[in-house]
Amino acid sequence: MSLTELDDGLVRRMAMGAVFSDFGGKIHSVGFHRTDDLLVTSSEDDSLRLFDIANAKQLKITYHKKHGTDRVCFTHHPSSLICSSRYNLESTGESLRYLSMYDNRILRYFKGHKDRVVSLCMSPINDSFMSGSLDRSVRLWDLRVNACQGILHLRGRPAVAYDQQGLVFAIAMEGGAVKLFDSRCYDKGPFDTFLVGGDTAEVNDIKFSNDGKSMLLTTTNNNIYVLDAYRGEKKCGFSLEPSQGTPIEATFTPDGKYVLSGSGDGTLHAWNIENPSEVARWENNIGVVSCLKWAPRRAMFVAASTVLTFWIPNDGESPAPADPPTDQQQ
């Protein structure tokens, strides 16, 4: 369903519409293409999978046994991805790969990180991208160049995000510190720093709303904060049940009016952040949801654990069965 104006009623009507259950382990990361109806997933079975979200079909699967698959995001091209590695980081240094799903080919390796990449973000306006690693660094890259374009050394686990104009990027770290940089002159240091007081946990994820007015922080102890992106003030916050060993992900809706998140008890939640209140709570049968994202241009979100689910407004019909893979490469 195409994206219409969201309201509390439509959000409450969201229900599971398709299920893909043939993953060989936990799903690590999911990402939508900005303009095409495509979704990519990475999972514990070392696979990358491409989905047509308009028709709920799996289009392709490729396996990457040498490096594994961890964080993944689309570039601007609908068949090109950036994927981080899980294996051989110390021996090869090949922490990131630029690859083509069209012919399962590595287009470029990006070396530098000495530990897992836990945050990955593509610029919305050019070929730049950022990666944050457990080696306590954020690196800035250009798809056209092998060498790292810049490095920022930090304390603790970093989370990174560009705003939707690509002019500003944010880095969040433990203790609730959020630093904002001008992407054109980041070497001058942050132009603003916010502190989310009272929470000493590491930040697991950070996102900007599409309108650039809000930021969404998720911590490793399952607290969620919505911040004013201009002043750094906390607009609202939510606490979820703990999920031992499984970080949860929260997401904005495209209009920036709602936030959705999983919880350690296996439930899903939606809040209206303009008048902070919970508007929906869903039970699901797939366990703790570790990956959750709302589609950029559709009334649809995906939730994943070891199973991938597509959620759409309930029209009274039964969930659609998932199609089998149409293309598979080793």
Curated annotation (Swiss-Prot):
Similarity comment text for this entry: Belongs to the WD repeat SWD2 family.
Species in which this protein is naturally found: Arabidopsis thaliana (Mouse-ear cress)
GO BP field: flower development; regulation of long-day photoperiodism, flowering; regulation of timing of transition from vegetative to reproductive phase
Classification via PROSITE patterns: WD_REPEATS_1, WD_REPEATS_2, WD_REPEATS_REGION
Cellular compartment(s): Nucleus
Tissue specificity remark: Expressed in the shoot apical meristem (SAM), embryos, seedlings, cotyledons, leaves primordia, young leaves and roots.
Entries under InterPro entries matching the protein: G-protein_beta_WD-40_rep, Swd2/WDR82, WD40/YVTN_repeat-like_dom_sf, WD40_repeat_CS, WD40_repeat_dom_sf, WD40_rpt
Keyword set, alphabetical order: Flowering, Nucleus, Repeat, WD repeat
Record-given protein name: Protein ANTHESIS POMOTING FACTOR 1
Domain of life: Eukaryota
Gene Ontology, cellular component aspect: Cul4-RING E3 ubiquitin ligase complex; nucleus
Primary location class: nucleus
Pfam family membership, one: WD40
WD repeat placement: 22-61, 112-151, 153-191, 198-237, 242-281, 284-323
